Structures are given as structure tokens and as C-alpha cells.
From Swiss-Prot:
Location of this chain's protein in the cell: Cytoplasm, Cytosol; Nucleus
Gene name, Swiss-Prot/TrEMBL: UBL4A
GO biological process, one term: tail-anchored membrane protein insertion into ER membrane
Major localization listed first in the record, in broad terms: cytoplasm
Protein task: As part of a cytosolic protein quality control complex, the BAG6/BAT3 complex, maintains misfolded and hydrophobic patches-containing proteins in a soluble state and participates in their proper delivery to the endoplasmic reticulum or alternatively can promote their sorting to the proteasome where they undergo degradation. The BAG6/BAT3 complex is involved in the post-translational delivery of tail-anchored/type II transmembrane proteins to the endoplasmic reticulum membrane.
Cross-link (Glycyl lysine isopeptide (Lys-Gly) (interchain with G-Cter in ubiquitin)): 48
Domain Ubiquitin-like: 1-76
Entry PTM: Polyubiquitinated. Ubiquitination by AMFR and deubiquitination by USP13 may regulate the interaction between the BAG6/BAT complex and SGTA and therefore may regulate client proteins fate.
Organism, as annotated: Callithrix jacchus
Protein's UniProt name: Ubiquitin-like protein 4A
Recorded GO CC terms: BAT3 complex; cytosol; membrane; nucleoplasm
Pfam family, one: ubiquitin
Modified-residue entries (Phosphoserine), positions: 90
Region (Required and sufficient for interaction with BAG6): 96-138
Alphabetical keyword list: Cytoplasm, Isopeptide bond, Nucleus, Phosphoprotein, Transport, Ubl conjugation
Amino acid sequence: MQLTVKALQGRDCSLQVPEDELVSTLKQLVSEKLNVPVRQQRLLFKGKALADGKRLSDYSIGPNSKLNLVVKPLEKVLLEEGTGRRLADSPPPQVWQLISKVLARHFSAADASRVLEQLQRDYERSLSRLTLDDIERLAGRFLHPEVTETMEKGFSK
């Protein structure tokens, strides 16, 4: 379907996307067309802000719809990220997009959406439960993989 995204400064772009596309994917496309970083974007449809993890169809966005783009000042984005949530809390939207595509091959659109939402909740819960010791162990494995391999070989004998 064809969508028009109009920034408050007057610039706009037309995009061709499927009706069940993720908002995060749409933001990536808008970023490429209008050169507005994803993290500075806030998309609105009929005055309502669109959430990254939702699909366009969740908001009844149909063909030829017009979305408004509010560009958040970089200072505000950095402040929100610093106080509201850590940058590493969530994988890049591309990861969720790829997972969504895999799920779409095996489930109906509604079921795939529910599975993806549950996976995202589980991911966030797992991250929030990591202790500093867990993080230190993970960092050690990434920084010194040869030590981990040696230890694993020692245990397998």
C-alpha cells in the first residue's frame, strides 16, 4: 500500500509498504528517504503516536493514509535515552524485523504478532535479571574466547 509521511517542517515522502509492516520498519524507510535518524522520529496517525513494536494494521492504517512525522531534537533524545532506558536494552529493530519475517512463515499474522510480542517481553525480562557478575562473565567470554574454548575442552575430556 502507498503511504505519505509528512514532517512538520514541510518535507514529505511517499512509501510503498505492506499493510502488516512493523512501525519500526517504516521508521527505517523514512530515515532513508528524509534523512531523519530513527531515534529522533515520532510517527503519528490521526494524532496518535505509533509504537515501534506494533504493525500498521494494528492502527487500521490503510492505503493512501497520511502519517505525520515529528522530529525530536537530538538533545531531548539523548536525555530520554540517558535517564529513561539504556541504549543496549533492545536489539536493533532489524533483529525484530528478521524474527518477524521468520515467524510470518510459520504462523498466521495474528499469531506471529503475539509470539513476537511475547519474545520481546521475555528478552526484556531476561536482560533486566542480569547481574553484574553475569555481565562480567559474558564480557570475559567475548574479550577472551580462547580461554573459554580451553575451559570447554578441559571439561569435555
